[in-house]
Amino acid sequence: MSSRENPDTSAPMAQQQPQQQQQQQQPQPQQQQQQQQQQQQAQQTTQQQQSPQQPSQQSPLPAAAAAASVIAPVPLPQNGSNGAALGVTENLVCQWQGCQERLPTAEALYEHVCERHVGRKSTNNLNLTCGWANCRTTTVKRDHITSHIRVHVPLKPHKCDFCGKAFKRPQDLKKHVKTHADDSVLVRSPEPGPGTRPPNGMFGVGVGADGKCSLGHVHGQGYPHGAPQYYQTPHQQHPSNPSYGNVYYAIGSDSHQASYESKKRGYDALNEFFGDLKRRQFDPTSYAVVGQRLLNLHGLPLPLVNGAAVAVPEYQTQPMPAMVSVGHGGGHSGGGGYQPASPMQSYHLPPMGNLRTKADLMNIDQFLEQMQSTVYESDDHVAAAGVAQPGAHYVQHGGMSYRTSHSSNNANANANASHTATSSPPSAATNIPSTHATATTTTTSAPMIPTSSAARLLPTHAPRHALTPPSSAQSYTSGRSPVSVSSTHHHIPPSHHYTHTHNHNHNHPNSSAGMYPTLPATSAQDGSSTNTYHGVSGAAAPSTLSSVFDSEGGRRYAGGCCRGLDRGLWRRHHRRRQGSPSMSFAEVGGNDTKTASPSMSFSASVIDPALQAGSEKQSGSSGSGGEAGAGAGAGAGAGEERNGSSSSPTADVEEVSRALSSANATTTMATKTAPPEVPSHTVEQWVANVRLLEKLRLYIYERLSR
């Protein structure tokens, strides 16, 4: 019986053991390689305990029994905290190839990998390839691989100040901080103390004792004084918003902002203009193109001070808008309100990109010089623009007049004196200054304009503001400069010039003849030519300095003077004019001929005495019939010979007649080709262009000098 019961009892025991094994294996987690040593020790102790209890039992299933004995002593996880602790413990094992060393902390594990596996170049064991598990990442520097090892090690020393999240590498923290960009109004900054400027951010919040940003209420303690009375707000009975502390925002003056934007706009326009000059994007010899390009700079606040006397440095500081604080009812700062804050750091205008080097400045200065020569000295372009009138030296501009040629400032004559009758007082004729349109003692090559048109062109009042071209004050060698022009034109007889200059300076002691000598117009040496313009049509002849000023009055010149004039007669005439300044001369005006007595007429002094006596016998009064303003002395003598009876003609009379016909032809041509009256806006634009070019050149000069 016993032999039968034993197999029956052993069968249920063998069936219970696999069932227990399955029940215990279900909650059992997967075994790790790190626990092999503990499992072996537990297996040995279990076998020693089971061997005395079942000495007679044969083990038909030794593998199952061994497995059951091994599983029995392993403790099962009770809760999630134990599992987390187990995971942290497992992560502190070095998984470098060939190393299974366990470290107590993450810092120790990181130091272990860096020192033992990465090594150093100084110890000749530097390894730049990551051997953690199957990573195989290779770097070029030790710093790079040590930063890479932080990815494998659970060491997170970098914490976010906003949310407290920790990161392994500093670059990971920077990426995370960018996710808080939506919360940029909450910039962590300390509360401003007395005398300190507001934080860099537009808004400020408090900082807690633990170093993290505190979004709670922050008392206003930045400024010891209360808010201004006119901004004072009543005491709030209800608590303020606890989400923010003191808020800082800009309420800068709009005038400063507008001033900066205006200066910035002018600065950019000037920089663009200089860039066009460097790239030669327009023709500097075209008056229309230059005027159109300069028109873009008019009206803009260019960086020039007091007419470009001093150039403004490109790093010009401008005040920033002030920052103010708005308190939220702290009670310590005297209640809420607007608090004045100290100004922030100044900002500057950007540097000009087209004026970086000295070569740029010199090239632009040369280009501006070409433009200046075009505006000043191109007769054809200026005449086409309606600024220059043939034979006229002044252009009326509102209440002011500008001199457009190189002539003397003594030319501000009263044009109404041209219409003075012979019955006027003798002193009226002597006070008429010389101009190229009305002077009767200066031979001119400019087209003769009738007195009516001269009266319209010449101003009768207002002071003259000279716009002296650079060619008369500086060493410019342009094609229209006085040096080049005077060398290509003929010279005027100094006999006429000397006489007129002496009387003119005598009557006008306050004239500027010291700086500007009397500038006669150029004349053709041959008086018989019918066209005194050579290659210039419809444009103002340039008034230039004469290269020869001969003070000797005894020399004889051809053209306009009788050949029979001797040295003694000239000296007697000169002394007689000095003794009687009230001597009158022939007036020429329009188509009317004013006559003067032969004894008082200036024409009588330049005619041979024999011819003058014959003329007095034939006619009671003589007058000049010519309409010319210059060379009227010779014209008057020819008129006397024409109006009188037929006397024996001489060679001198024939020469005078030819000169008179030449002057009449020139006057007719000038009358036909005279342009209409100059529009005021054209003159204003020309003057603005002249002044702008002068300012720009002075600005470049200041930059070059620095």
UniProtKB/Swiss-Prot annotation:
Keyword Transcription attributed: yes
Keywords associated with the record: Activator, DNA-binding, Metal-binding, Nucleus, Repeat, Repressor, Transcription, Transcription regulation, Zinc, Zinc-finger
Gene Ontology molecular function terms on file: DNA binding; zinc ion binding
Chain residue ranges for the region called Disordered: 1-65, 397-434, 463-543, 573-679
Bilayer-crossing regions: none
GO BP, sorted A to Z: positive regulation of transcription by RNA polymerase II
Cellular component, GO, one term: nucleus
SS bond partners: none
Biased composition (Polar residues): 1-13, 469-480, 520-534, 592-604
Chief location of this protein within or outside the cell: nucleus
Zinc finger (C2H2-type): 92-117, 128-152, 158-180
SUPFAM superfamilies reported in the protein's UniProt record: beta-beta-alpha zinc fingers (SSF57667)
Compositionally biased residues, Low complexity: 14-65, 404-434, 659-674
SMART domains referenced in this protein's UniProt entry, alphabetically: ZnF_C2H2
InterPro entries: pacC/RIM101, Znf_C2H2_sf, Znf_C2H2_type
Bias (Basic residues) ranges: 488-507
Biased composition, class Gly residues, residue ranges: 622-638
Subcellular location: Nucleus
Zinc recorded as keyword: yes
Family: Belongs to the pacC/RIM101 family.
Functional note: Transcription factor that mediates regulation of both acid- and alkaline-expressed genes in response to ambient pH. At alkaline ambient pH, activates transcription of alkaline-expressed genes (including pacC itself) and represses transcription of acid-expressed genes.
Protein's UniProt name: pH-response transcription factor pacC/RIM101
